[in-house]
Structures are given as C-alpha cells and as structure tokens.
From Swiss-Prot:
Coiled-coil intervals: none
UniProt entry keywords in alphabetical sequence: NAD, Oxidoreductase, Repeat
GO molecular function terms attached to this record: thioredoxin-disulfide reductase (NADPH) activity
Protein's organism: Arabidopsis thaliana
Reaction catalysis annotation: [protein]-dithiol + NAD(+) = [protein]-disulfide + NADH + H(+); [protein]-dithiol + NADP(+) = [protein]-disulfide + NADPH + H(+)
One matching Pfam family: Thioredoxin_8
Name of the molecule in the record: Probable nucleoredoxin 3
Amino acid sequence: MAVSADYQVKFPESGDLYSILAAEGIEFLLSHSGEVPLEYIHGKTICLFFSAIWCRPCKDFTPELIKLYENLQNRGEELEIIFVSFDHDMTSFYEHFWCMPWLAVPFNLSLLNKLRDKYGISRIPSLVPLYSDEISVAEDVIGLIEDYGSEAFPFTKKRKEELKAIDDSKRLGGQLEKLLTHESRNYVVARNGSKVLVSKLVGKTIGLYFGAHWCPPFRSFTSQLVDVYNELATTDKGSFEVILISTDRDSREFNINMTNMPWLAIPYEDRTRQDLCRIFNVKLIPALVIIGPEEKTVTTNAREMVSLYGSRSFPFTESRIVELKACLKKEGDSLPRKVKDNKHEHELKLDMAKAYVCDFCKKQGRFWAFSCNACDYDLHPTCVEEEEALLV
C-alpha cells in the first residue's frame, strides 16, 4: 500500500532533521554499503530510532523492529528508519549498527544532544515518526509495535484508533473464529499435537486460560480448573472447553504446561497469544475469561468464580452466581448453627469454607461444614448424626 502525501517527511527551512544535520556539517547518512546522500531520504516516510548497545530493552526490541522493517519493505512501503546512537563510543556504535538493515546518522555526540532535545527523548529505545498525525514519544510507538507488529504502521494516531477498534470488535463482536484464528491458522492444538478446528468449538462455553508454568498461583489454580473441567466433561457432555493462552517464557515451559492439562491451546509460536492478552487487558496471571455459547464475552473474572464455587459456577454467568448464593443461603438456613457429634469431643459450629476434607469420610467438601476451630476438625453436614444435632 502506498503512503499518502500526509505521511511524507517534510523539510522546513529550520528546526527539522535536515536543518540539524546541516548545522553539524553532516552531508550524508551511513549504510552498510557506504555513505548515502541526504537527498536519498526526501519523499520517504522517516522514523528516527534512538538506541544503544548497552541498553537491554534496546537489544530486546531491535530484532522486533528489524522484523517489522523487513515486512514493510516486502510490502513495498516507503519507510526509512534512521538509527541515532546513544552508545558510549564509536566501536559500540558500529557493533550495534552492524545488525541493523537501515541507515544511521554518523556517530556524533553534539548531534545526538541536539536530536535528543529536538524530539524530547527521555528514554531508549524510542522510535520517532517524522510526519503529520504521528504518535508522540510520550504516546509510546514502541509499545504499539510490541502489541501489533507491522500492523501498527504507519504509526499514526488514526491507525492507533483503528487498531483499538479492531480489538474492541474482536472482544465484543461475538465471533469466536475471528477472535482465535487468522488466515494462516484456523485451529488450536491438543497436548498430543493433534489439531482441533476452532469452528468445531462454536456453540460451547469456552474458557480462555492465561498463565505460565513458572507462576505458582497458576499451577495451584490449574489443579482446581482440571477438577472442574473433568467434572463438567462428565455432567455436561463436553459443553465446556478450555484453551490455554500461554505466557510461558519459552516453548519448553509451554510443553511442560501442556503435559499437565487435558484441554487445548493456542500454538506457542502464534502471535495470537499476545493479541489475546492485549484484547482482554490481562495484567495478572492466572486469568480465566469465559466466552459463552453465543460467542460473546461472559466474564473476565471466572477465576474467582471457580475458586469459590467450583463446577457449580458453570456456565459462569452473573445470574448463575446470584442463583448459587441464594441456593447456598437456603442450604445454610436449613442447617443447625451448632451440633454435638459423638465422633468428636467438642461442639461443632456451622461454617462456610471454599474447600475442605471431611475428617470422617475423608472426602473433599465445599461450602457448608461443621467445624471445630480448636482442633481443625471438619465434617460434611451429611456426616453428622442428625439425632444429636442441637438447633440453636
């Protein structure tokens, strides 16, 4: 796609890039094949890339920017990036520039200071577009590229608004395939490596499960979710499916994760993982987002529902939680406040617990229990001998 005239670099008489370079006596830019006259950048879409080899975030971001640049070149975009070095010396400058496929201004501390002041650079890496409607440094072009890759081009406020609207459409639009697939992938994967078409999942309640193996709360919650998943697989005949959205640090951790899970996953190498984290604004893990049978977002806080109510919270709607609370209150109202059971020496009080193990039948329990806090002793209400119950 051709870039419109509004995005072409402009060279007013003073105060712009061209004037600053001329004031320093610089008549050329650098490339790996030699010097490039300044006239070469006329008519091109220009971005200044402020970076340094000593900066870890710069070293992490530069490969991502190279990938974006090469993609845009292959698309025929007239983008030119110019490297402005924050390196400490000439040797470091050339070492850093060596990996870059674009141009650079000559290493010059006086020039660096002028460009830094002109464009308000307070941190690196920074990418500064030089055209109308550009996103400012404060508005974070780097973050936009990390979120959207080459789709962020041409780095304008209008494009940023368009991308946000696309995210909103995917989150609210009620189309599971549009949310989870793209033109190169229409499936999710199982732990045995098999592929499951996303179209086959339409009509089910889908849990998008965000997390990573290195995270202890994630591993703890996974065991709860596995129990819920297996219970619902039996009682609701496959109407619930979970899809892992991995935030693991590498594919090895992802594979370890998958061996402990009975459900599906977005492939680790697929960018959709990052897209979904952004679309649902996932900042903390684990997180569980529910997409209903109508393909619309039901809740972004299903983790709390599962932790509190287990499989009884299915299908994870607010109305179901209201119903559950009313049901549990009714159950509690029908039970005595205290009991004296011959299996334990102390009086037992009615209590609400997320989960416990009954000290008589040794089976797990949820919600109502008769407990002795002094002895950490719990009984299912059904394991209490009713004839000894003392109504209070």
